[in-house]
Amino acid sequence: GKTINKSRHAYALGQLVLWSPIDDLIDTKASILQSRDFRFIAMANPKIAPYGEATRQTLTSMNLWKALEEKLIRGENIAQTFQFVNSGNAKLGFISFSQIVNSNYEVNGSYWKVPKSLYEPIEQQVVLLNESFLAEDFLSYLLSEESQKIISRFGYDIPL
């Protein structure tokens, strides 16, 4: 292969949330999903976006995929999905927790952190493509305790 042997590592795990800019719309059980009291719900495209696939898995685990299918609007990625909700085109949507805690502006509203048991881990991975002291140093830093604390502060879980 074209990668350095044993250099592939998961350094962060994405966390899926259901978010709305409307205060108190989403409760701790995401009851709104069962009530279906919304016109549209945004998600990333599950065919090309890991968070979209995690959303599909979540709704399937909750036996809601078929029931909500006609209300789903799909963004190409979670950035576009966030914009659908933030602009009001959808009342709520599934995004990355990091988009709420790491925003260039204050993000208001309500959210439900999706239990990890409802979707496969969303691994953020790194791999070295060639021998380079700088790349190896960066990889060491990325996997260091110092870096992991920063990554965690920005809304990601740390793999064991």
Write out the residue ranges for each language-model feature.
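Exported/periplasmic ABC-transporter solute-binding proteins
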Residues: G1, S7-L160
